[in-house]
């Protein structure tokens, strides 16, 4: 399902801004010197429609073939998402210039990190600064130097036939052609030396170390085919939660992979800090807040020799969004692998809140009732709040669904036809439900 949805274009960026970032001397004129880039590739049918395959033959940048853009002769910021179904991109510029990485998945780094190449795996995000000062009238290409990728990294394979064969495999290719124009007013012309101070998690404060495994499915009974990859020796089961994580737990997750292939591992709910990859501390560009980490394939191996597994450790604090009913996912960010069952789930539980509130009635009032515009909700217990609200009509048809609703300004029901409706609230802490009736006149 995920592969199909991504193929059809369901994927993009949300740009989050705050007062700390806005105080820095960074480009932020959207579309001028602050440019989002979603990288992906597609295969086209003879009728010019997307086909659902792991690798495409054509590079698309912001869903544009042979993309090009004009940028000013100054420092330009690119916010880049690898939105590919499977492929990693070894980013670099055609003239070998350096560029500065200023963020990882979860926000700003302590300082810009200057590189000439950077491998961005599926689902990962970075922001980079490129200094084009004094280069008006010239051009340069952002490229994928995928001929340099190892054969067990997505995009580094070179299959001539079969479902993974593609024109771009193990090749270098253009991502974006940049035409450099005139400098703008109030241009940023230098890259800052420092950014912010991240306070990272301390391994000594971990409450537990959880050990996960990644493996190939070959030879295992009841697992689909030799091309499937699995987490913790099982396929995904929507009715099974692998872990119950207490709210406010600080945890080390240690992932050991005997898979020959590398996998970008993604976790929902939290941002984490990488502790080590095969015993080595993360690079400066990987030392910030992350939610995707690349788990390398094992090294060595052959007949009678299983090879040496790779081991990646990260640390995270699960300090919000406790919900014993609705789990969070962790999975490979290669969509095909995820769809084949390379995924697990966990719940974050707040036992104190449940114990305090499980026997507490949900006392709530709706006003004005009847209404034809806004409907306001008031909890009698100030410690209670809405986790989820559903509005249905008298036939049971769902008309409104509001996860984590903001209730201060009321719920707009002006679009509802005149009649009787039922509003069901799931309370945020106890997860108990209550239903109230209101009238739209």
Which stretches of residues belong to each language-model region?
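C-terminal soluble interaction/assembly domains
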Residues: 274-299, 304-307, 314-317
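Short coil/turn motif common to extracellular beta-sandwich-like domains
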Residues: 72-75, 247-250, 369-376
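C-terminal outer-membrane/trafficking sorting elements
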Residues: 355-367, 371-441
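Acidic-aromatic/histidine active-site loop/patch
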Residues: 30-75, 79-85
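Extended terminal and domain-junction accessory segments
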Residues: 4-40, 110-262, 269, 274, ...
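Beta-strand-rich interaction surfaces with strong enrichment in secreted/lumenal proteins
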Residues: 66-68, 114-118, 240-243, 290-305
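Short solvent-exposed strand-capping/beta-turn motif centered on an Asx-Ser/Thr pair
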Residues: 81-86, 217, 256-260, 380-384
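A glycine-anchored, Pro-Gly-centered beta-turn/N-cap motif
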Residues: 74, 249, 326, 331, ...
């Amino acid at each position: 399902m995920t592969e199909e949805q991504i193929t059809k274009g369901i994927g993009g960026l949300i740009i989050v801004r705050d007062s700390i970032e806005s105080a820095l001397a960074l480009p932020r004129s959207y579309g001028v010197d602050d440019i989002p880039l979603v990288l992906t590739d597609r295969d086209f049918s003879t009728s010019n429609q997307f086909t659902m395959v792991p690798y495409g033959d054509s590079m698309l940048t912001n869903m544009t073939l042979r993309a090009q853009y004009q940028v000013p002769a100054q420092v330009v910021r690119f916010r880049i998402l690898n939105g590919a179904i499977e492929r990693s991109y070894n980013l670099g510029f055609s003239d070998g210039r350096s560029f500065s990485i200023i963020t990882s998945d979860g926000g700003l780094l302590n300082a810009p990190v200057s590189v000439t190449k950077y491998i961005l795996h599926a689902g990962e995000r970075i922001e980079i600064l490129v200094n084009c000062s004094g280069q008006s009238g010239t051009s340069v290409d952002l490229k994928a130097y995928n001929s340099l990728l190892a054969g067990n990294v997505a995009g580094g394979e070179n299959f001539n036939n079969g479902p993974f064969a593609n024109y771009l495999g193990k090749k270098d290719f253009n991502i974006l052609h940049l035409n450099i124009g005139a400098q703008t007013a109030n241009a940023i012309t230098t890259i800052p030396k420092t950014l912010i101070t991240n306070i990272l998690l301390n391994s000594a404060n971990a409450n537990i170390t959880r050990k996960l495994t990644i493996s190939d499915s070959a030879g295992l009974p009841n697992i689909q085919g030799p091309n499937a990859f699995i987490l913790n020796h099982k396929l995904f089961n929507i009715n099974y939660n692998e872990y119950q994580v207490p709210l406010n737990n600080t945890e080390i997750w240690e992932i050991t992979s005997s898979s020959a292939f590398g996998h970008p591992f993604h976790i929902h709910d939290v941002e984490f800090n990488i502790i080590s990859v095969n015993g080595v501390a993360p690079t400066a560009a990987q030392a910030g807040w992350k939610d995707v980490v690349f788990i390398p394939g094992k090294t060595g191996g052959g007949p009678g020799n299983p090879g040496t597994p790779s081991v990646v450790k990260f640390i995270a604090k699960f300090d919000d969004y406790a919900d014993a009913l609705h789990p969070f996912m962790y999975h490979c960010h290669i969509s095909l692998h995820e769809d084949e069952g390379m995924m697990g789930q966990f719940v974050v539980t707040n036992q104190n809140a449940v114990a305090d509130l499980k026997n507490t009635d949900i006392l709530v009032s709706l006003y004005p009732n009847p209404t034809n515009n806004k409907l306001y909700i008031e909890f009698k217990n100030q410690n209670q709040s809405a986790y989820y609200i559903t509005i249905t009509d008298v036939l049971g048809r769902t008309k409104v669904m509001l996860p984590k609703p903001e209730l201060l300004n009321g719920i707009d029901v002006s679009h509802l036809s005149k009649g009787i409706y039922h509003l069901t609230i799931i309370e945020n802490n106890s997860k108990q439900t209550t239903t109230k009736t209101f009238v739209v006149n």
